[in-house]
């Protein structure tokens, strides 16, 4: 079976969701709750999925504790693609706000993984504000303040390994008059 492609690429999207499950002591201990303190706990799982957008099926899914690192799970799922489906075609990964992470961007770029990520206005804020056009390659400098967050973590060596990285920022004008900024490599 020949899969549907976009410009010779498979198109994957990653996303996470919280799902209510039966509230039992075992589920609360194993998966946790997102309920506020002082309210009745509701057991939930955190579900991370990697979805083939054009062929319309889930490639990978992981069940996690309710509050989980969606980007870390997404990276693991992308890393498993060769064993999961035997990827022989180029692909790119679409991610929503909440996924942008400097270490994740660097790891994906180092591995040659193409991505498109919707940014929040606070992501690379100064670079977004300095955009002179709707489509620019921008140098993201790894300043002391950007690196500070990763000091003493597993990502310290990675963010210290370079002065910055080049990323393409694309502004998309929406029908309602708002704009979204996408980051891609």
Predicted regions and their residues:
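Short, basic alpha-helical nucleic acid-contact segments in DNA-binding proteins
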Residues: 1
């Amino acid at each position: 079976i020949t899969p549907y492609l976009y410009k010779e690429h498979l198109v994957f999207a990653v996303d996470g969701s919280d799902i209510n499950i039966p509230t039992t002591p075992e589920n609360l201990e194993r998966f946790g709750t997102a309920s506020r303190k002082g309210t009745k706990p509701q057991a939930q799982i955190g579900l991370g999925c990697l979805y083939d957008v054009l062929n319309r099926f889930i490639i990978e899914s992981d069940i996690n504790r309710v509050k989980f690192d969606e980007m870390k799970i997404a990276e693991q799922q992308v890393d498993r693609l060769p064993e999961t489906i035997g990827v022989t075609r180029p692909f790119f990964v679409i991610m929503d706000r909440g996924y942008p992470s400097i270490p994740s961007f660097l790891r994906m770029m180092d591995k040659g993984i193409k991505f498109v990520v919707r940014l929040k206005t606070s992501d690379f804020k100064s670079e977004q504000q300095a955009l002179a056009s709707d489509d620019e390659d921008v140098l993201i400098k790894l300043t002391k303040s950007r690196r500070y967050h990763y000091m003493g973590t597993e990502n310290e060596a990675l963010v210290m390994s370079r002065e910055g990285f080049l990323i393409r920022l694309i502004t998309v004008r929406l029908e309602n008059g708002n704009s979204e900024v996408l980051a891609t490599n």
